[in-house]
Amino acid sequence: MASTSGALVDDNVLEVLRKAQLDAFISQFVFLFNVRRFDHFSHVRDKDMLEIGMQQVQIRQLREQILKMSREMWNRSDPKQVYIQADQSMPAQNSIDEKALIPNEQIKLYELIGEGSFAVVKRGTWTQSNGTHVNVAVKILRDISPNIMDDLRVEASHLLKLQHPSLIRLYGIVRQPAMMVFELCEGGSLLDRLRDDKKAILLVSRLHDYCMQIAKALQFLESKHCVHRDVAARNILLARDERTVKICDFGLMRALKENEQMYTMAPQKKVPFAWCPPEALRHRKFSHASDVWSYGVTIWEVFTFGEEPWVGCRAIDVLKNIDAGERLEKPKYCSERIYQIMKNCWKFNPAERCKFGAIREDLVAAMFLDAVARETYNSIQPGALQLTKGDEVVVVENTGQDWFGQNKKNQKFGTFPRSVVFAQTNNAVAAATAVTPQKVPTAPTIRIPPSHPPPAPLKPLNNNTKTSLNDRTSKISMPVAGSFIHTGHGDPLGGQSWGNPATIADMYLKNPVNGAPLSSMSSGAEIIASKELLTNGGRSTHQPAAPSPAVMSKIRGLSLDLPEYDDFDRAFDDGFSPSKIELPREFCGNDSVISGGSNSIGLANTYVMEPPKQAFDIRGNRVLPPTNKAPVLIPTNPAPSVISSTASAGITLSTNSSQMFTSQDRHSNMPANLFPELQHRLNQGSSTGNGVRPRPASSIGIQNNDLSMLNPQVNRPFSVVNVPIVQQPANIPCLVPTPAPPAPAHFSQPVSSQRVAQQQQNTLQKALNDELKGNLNKRPTGTTAPPSNGFNAPRADVAPVQQRPISSASIPALQPQPIQHIQKPIQPQQVRIPPSTAPVQKPVQVSAPTHSNVAPTTSSQASADARNPLPPKTSPPVSNTPITVAPVHAAPTTSAPSTSVVTRRPTSTTAQMSDEERRSRIAMDISSALPAPSALLYGSNSTSSLPSAAVSTASSVPSTARDNPVETRPSQPHVTMPPKKSSEPILSSEVLQPTRLPSATTSQAKPVTQPIRHPSPPVATVIPTAVVDKKPVSQNQGSNVPLFNITNSSNGYPQLNGYPNYGNGFQAYGYGMNYHQGYPGYQGYNSYGNGMGQLALTHNAVTSLPPLVPSENRFSGTAQPLGESDIMEFLGTQQRQAGSSSRAVPPASASTSAASGITDLSMADKMEVLYREADFTHKGNCDTMVSQCNGNTEQALKLLKQQHLVDMELAMSTETARQALEARQYDLPAAANMLLG
């Protein structure tokens, strides 16, 4: 059959060539360079154009026209194809050699071995002219149209030139019938082999090799400017030995798809949408980047052993998932690095996808390790891999303690400990799969003068010759950084060799260098934390012996032995703390500071000192008693046990450090293991008695709570020596938190003598006494003071020189200190008080404390008040008159409760406060506003969930406070704490009773107290049972909706992104939450079913929304449900309003039909139906389309669906969209699926 000599070319290709004045070269570009589309210009090189006779000026003009056309492509319609007749004078470049034409009688066909989308494949035999029989695979094309035959001839000419080991070989073609003769791969399809259950499972290492061969073949096609277009596991063939794979169908898909009609409207089974990138599904563009995407899906098939990608999804579903950022999940039997290669192939932007050359490099780096089991591993854990000694394992994942791999003997997968295998790190890819180890600090160079003998040899690591081979090999690890020492050199030519293995110094042979191996812990063997772990089964039993004086007299250098804990994880498990690190101390005459284990003084200038005696601490480190007591810094914030007053609370610094060591020598023989316990007790103190807060001791120059003086021989690593004492002023200008320790009633020693006694007291004895006193204070005696909640107001009315018993109820937790060096007064800070929902009295502001000479109460009186508190009284009715209050600082009689009481009384003047009074006022505001910790954490004694407000009387106000009243503003609340019983347990067993919330459906009105959100007088609101329409009606207001329904409508403003949902809130246009039955009004967002929402609604939509009007329950704190009458009134008003607004100017037909019968839908109802049906677009588009259709909503819906398919680029024109919709009865998803194939 004679074939036509011509081709179909896009018109924009001819336009570019004509604008560049290259009409004479059109035949060469079309038939020689195969430029049929505009994007084919990118494959034409300048070298090729020079070979056909083009000049540099012509090439430059062509490039300019191509660039100009590329900028205009977005505004152009689809190109039209023009038939170009081939030039008969031009040599047939694409003509097939006569040797490639096979006569039909030489082919003998047998059984069917495969069936593809465009052809069937049968096994056959080709009898050559010399009589040789060759087994071949014959592909018989289904379509034999003239255009197909022309494309077949062109593609066959290219396939005959593509010779690669991983590409199927084309022997020739048969003209009649149209057949292509390929080499036969007896292994069959790779997809069938992966799914075959009767054969053994392929090793993952073999699968990795398949991926390497496929990538290499596709890289070869990329270099030849060939696009495969159908890379999949079904198009990969196996050889008989199953070691070689070959790609088939390359070039054929491109030849068939050059004709656009062959791609569109094809059956679903013929379109590999699961392997196609999004640009190929939308724009029918295939390139090398599309082959990269398909290659990623292919290796996903390989490592899932033949699973179907995107199973159960349609073409439109796959496109939606890809646009949403979803990708295929990680296969179970591939490593993380291979899955990363897949994700690199699945980049949404084609320009960001990697090339096949980079893919091959990544695959080499992700090659699997081979390991050998050094012992038998049998585990009953699910998913564990059973191993026998000597089994070979392919390691898939080698991160962590448990590895994942495949046993080569039984092809099973599972996890196993990395310690039971030995990884063959001699593989070239071992370093690539290992994690980069952390940098290990190198030890300083040791220079030993030759005049001195070498150090004493250490004991070898392990001299046990009876250890088995398995035990010895399990201790072998990769080389450690810095462990190779050049002790000899060999020269094959002679003359340059030096050194002998027999004369290597014992210092190098018997002193191991520990550290992280070069291959890191993830791929190497187990790291030995210390040398003792080699012989003690993983647990160190290091007990250093006392060195001899002869060894101590030698020159001291840095030891090669690392500390006992050089593995942080093991040290952390053993309870090791960084504060226990013992840094080495120099044996120099001066106490130099050692930082990081390095010494700034050279070894040549080091002076050796003979120690008087040897001493060792609990860890076995060598310590020496100091020759001279080094001066240290005294803590700048000592905790005095007795505080006299606020006037004399300045902290003084001691300038004589020798007083701290007056009584330490007598306790130097105390066991060192008691230090942590004493440290803990001193830091914590008595939890119920003194309440001393631990101070941070991490700063340099501050002792760790004065514990370092208990044992002067213990080397404290973080103490600084030879540092002069810092001179500080006598008074610290700051607010210092001071402790409030309890004192017994009989303890009345003066303050000055008590401080001296405390400073001279033994630290251990002080700790035991404090604990004893704390235990005594826990007993409910007659002199027990109520525990302080830490928030009481400071006692500013006590004279500084007055001596009285100290109790926790009278000592403030935050005591202001006198400031002498600050000239500018401190401004009072504004304290935000949390809102309260309890019915309390009108909020007031507590005035500043004033000085008064009130006789203090004794501890027995205070305890009696605490045991017998007055019950709180009900708050009187609140009036709108301004109320002032004066605070109460002390109770002169036992009738007043121990808690703070607020009294309302008129005042007329405002007192001028000093700086100290202002600070005291701030402290008292904080203490009075915050409730007791026990009431917050454990619950109060009351059965109500709200704190009761105590009512104060005029008799509880001191006379001094009455004489000097202070005006306050009633804008900030003063919450009084409920009284506490002294014998109340720590954890209260009483159950808190919930507070009943007010409801609008009750038969009678109930007063509801509003929470205080702004500094305004509280208002008691009465909620009526019936809704009374007394709210002002605006111009566009048809009905009022409570704020509860509007605020629960969506996540944004209801006017912009919501529409009514029949009284149940507002449905969201934008991103909203999923619909739930318990939360009506919420509807999930569908990225393809719904639009993104409109920012400006139409007039009809705006008028249908209820306005935002403040309701009565704005500050109620609880949502009031609507009654049945409210809902009916709201719905009726809204429908009337929507109907009146939408029926303003109806069409004549619509108005007639509406008036004729009640059953006909009104225009508003039709619009609502249209809005629901056309939820894929905006309401504004619906209104515009209805206007264009003269009110015909059905026609508007059809046009909207057609326009939506065009906007989604699923249809090339509205006519195509209309045909697809009519074929699917205007079912939009079905029509979109049909357009996608």
Curated annotation (Swiss-Prot):
A single GO BP annotation from the record? regulatory ncRNA-mediated post-transcriptional gene silencing
Q: What is its EC number?
A: 2.7.10.2
Q: Where are the compositionally biased (Polar residues) regions?
A: 749-766, 778-791, 847-863
Q: In which tissues is it expressed?
A: Ubiquitously present in all tissues tested. Expressed in the somatic cells of gut, pharynx, body wall muscle, neurons, skin and excretory canal cells.
Keywords from the UniProt entry: ATP-binding, Cytoplasm, Kinase, Nucleotide-binding, RNA-mediated gene silencing, SH3 domain, Transferase, Tyrosine-protein kinase
Enzyme class at the top of the EC tree: transferase
Q: What chemistry does it catalyse, as a reaction equation? A: L-tyrosyl-[protein] + ATP = O-phospho-L-tyrosyl-[protein] + ADP + H(+)
MF terms from GO for this chain are: ATP binding; non-membrane spanning protein tyrosine kinase activity; protein tyrosine kinase activity
**Taking every annotated instance into account, which residue ranges of this chain make up the domain SH3?**
366-426
Compositionally biased spans, kind Low complexity:
881-910, 940-961, 1138-1156
Give the recorded effect for R353Q: In qt38; induces defects in mobile RNA silencing
Main subcellular location of this protein, as a coarse class: cytoplasm
**GO CC, alphabetical:** cytoplasm; plasma membrane
Q: Which SUPFAM superfamilies match?
A: Protein kinase-like (PK-like), SH3-domain
Pfam families (UniProt xref): GTPase_binding (PF09027), PK_Tyr_Ser-Thr (PF07714), SAM_TNK (PF22931), SH3_2 (PF07653)
Q: Where is this region: Disordered?
A: 683-704, 741-802, 826-919, 940-986, 999-1018, 1134-1156
Q: What is its biological role?
A: Tyrosine-protein kinase which plays a role in RNA-mediated gene silencing by mediating import of double-stranded RNA (dsRNA) into cells. Not required for import of ingested dsRNA into intestinal cells but involved in subsequent export from intestinal cells to internal tissues.
Note what the entry says on domains. The kinase domain is required for import of dsRNA into cells.
Q: Which PANTHER family match?
A: TYROSINE-PROTEIN KINASE
**Similarity-based family:** Belongs to the protein kinase superfamily. Tyr protein kinase family. SYK/ZAP-70 subfamily.
The name of this protein is Tyrosine-protein kinase sid-3
Its lineage reads: Eukaryota, Metazoa, Ecdysozoa, Nematoda, Chromadorea
